[in-house]
Amino acid sequence: MSKQTYKVCFCFRRRYRHTVSVAPAEIKTLFDNYSDKGLMTTDLLLRFLIDVQKQDKATKEEAQDIVNASSSLLHRNGLHLDAFFKYLFAVTNSPLSSLEVHQDMDAPLSHYFIYTGHNSYLTGNQLSSDCSELPIIEALKKGVRVIELDIWPNSDEDGIDVLHGRTLTSPVELIKCLRAIREHAFDVSDYPVVVTLEDHLTPKLQAKVAEMVTDIFGEMLFTPPSGECLKEFPSPAFLKKRIMISTKPPKEYKAATDDDLVKKGRDLGDKEVWGREVPSFIRRDRSVDKNDSNGDDDDDDDDDDDDDDGDDKIKKNAPPEYKHLIAIEAGKPKGGITECLKVDPDKVRRLSLSEEQLEKASEKYAKQIVRFTQRNLLRVYPKGTRITSSNYNPLIAWSHGAQMVAFNMQGLGRSLWVMQGMFRGNGGCGYIKKPDLLLKSNAVFDPEATLPVKTTLRVTIYMGEGWYYDFPHTHFDRYSPPDFYTRVGIAGVPADTVMKKTKTLEDNWIPAWDEVFEFPLTVPELALLRIEVHEYDMSEKDDFGGQICLPVWELRQGIRAVPLRNQDGVKCRSVKLLVRLEFV
């Protein structure tokens, strides 16, 4: 037991004792129930794994492995209380049911949510940051499977740059981005990478792109049979280790001054280090859209406009080699949203809508959007006024079946944490099989419908530890140990979305909250468990202490060790919570 000294005023000091982790009362009770004379034998541990941890297929060999890993060489016949507590709080006691790919990967691409980036080359904001291949590499190393490149003629108009057009962003050469994709596409996942090209090139430069892409990607490149359109998308399993090109025609850009964009986007950035709470994680409010739309269905983010007028032009003027690259065709038919959502039985395609366009369309056409996404791909992207690279609530798009919910991966905050949480599922491969409710053709899911509760998730937050080892002792408070509290809740369909909070425990590096929360879920297939730890500060904003977001459908029941992550989504070295997860 060590002591810490904190300054008080100018000439006084206070000392606090730092205690060690001890098993919570409920853990001690469980140990007593599954032990004999202070020893949990392998047979009794196996009973515990089946009864409490709900590991129905657990074996005696697995129980013995736990004993071996948690005990000293002199006590391999079972677990004492300290060793039992050590096993429960070990990072190997994961809250996720599987850390490997375990879903069916043989369905068409349209049956999966796909980890998707927006303006993947930007290092910061949308207006003046540098363009580089480094954010692309970083995204691929995090499992992102869709990379977006805006391609423009360079200043001499004889080469191709990647940059955010009509802004002050500095360019990066296309060839650097393509080489980065080739080198890192399959660092963490063998499943396909889609490169979406926002094309602003002449036919001559398009021919150069075709040559570059073909030379650099080589046999990795997947192209459909010459002259044919895909009638159905191939599966992720079929496309393993392949790269696909998805593109749409050159576009006319609306004129907008930098000052206009700054004025519109100034209040959209996250104001706190962990990001302000996303309003639609609390409630879904459509009144803003209705009041501000003025009957105009256009979106301000012009660099994502799918217009089939341009599509006809590119097919007429583009060199054959360039057209042959396109594995996933993009297009937005004339005639408004009803035409956009028509399903062609002989052809599949990709449609892009901004977050605002999707919200407007979903007011009247929610079921049609879901039906469209059963065969076709829907990409949703941030509205153009998000110049700080902030993000939006992805659940609205996912609940309508949108596969490519495009995010600014540099836009830290709660929205990105939810995105990262979703794609921790299925082994982190970047593809999550959509739930059956979004794929039924005979009973199309209505995201706006009020549904009965399917199950209730009960979460017990026992305690946390690790901050003492990861942070200086005055990191959270100069005058005393930290005052931690935990926020726990659900991101999901509107009926399921909620956030709750534990009490604040003062002056404690190892807080033991021991509080229980229950979350009724109407659509557990689309729910994510959110946990955040903060340190209460009376005079300033609360300090960030860690966060995690996990897909509910992949949770393991029982008592689990939950490692927390920092604002970037990187796992903390030591910080973790002890929780119990139950479906009741």
Swiss-Prot record:
Amino acid composition bias (Acidic residues), ranges on this chain:
294-311
| SMART domains per the UniProt record, alphabetical | C2, PLCXc, PLCYc
The cofactor named in the record is: Ca(2+)
Where is the segment annotated Disordered?
285-318
**Keyword list, A-Z:** Cell membrane, Hydrolase, Lipid degradation, Lipid metabolism, Membrane, Phosphoprotein, Transducer
In this UniProt entry, the residues modified to Phosphoserine are: 287
An example molecular function term from Gene Ontology annotations: phosphatidylinositol-4,5-bisphosphate phospholipase C activity
The residue ranges of the EF-hand-like domain are 26-102
Provide the transmembrane region boundaries: none
Entry GO terms, CC = plasma membrane
Broad EC category: hydrolase
This molecule's function is given as: The production of the second messenger molecules diacylglycerol (DAG) and inositol 1,4,5-trisphosphate (IP3) is mediated by activated phosphatidylinositol-specific phospholipase C enzymes.
* Protein's name in the database: Phosphoinositide phospholipase C 7
The opening ranks of the lineage are:
Eukaryota, Viridiplantae, Streptophyta, Embryophyta, Tracheophyta
Name the gene behind this protein: PLC7
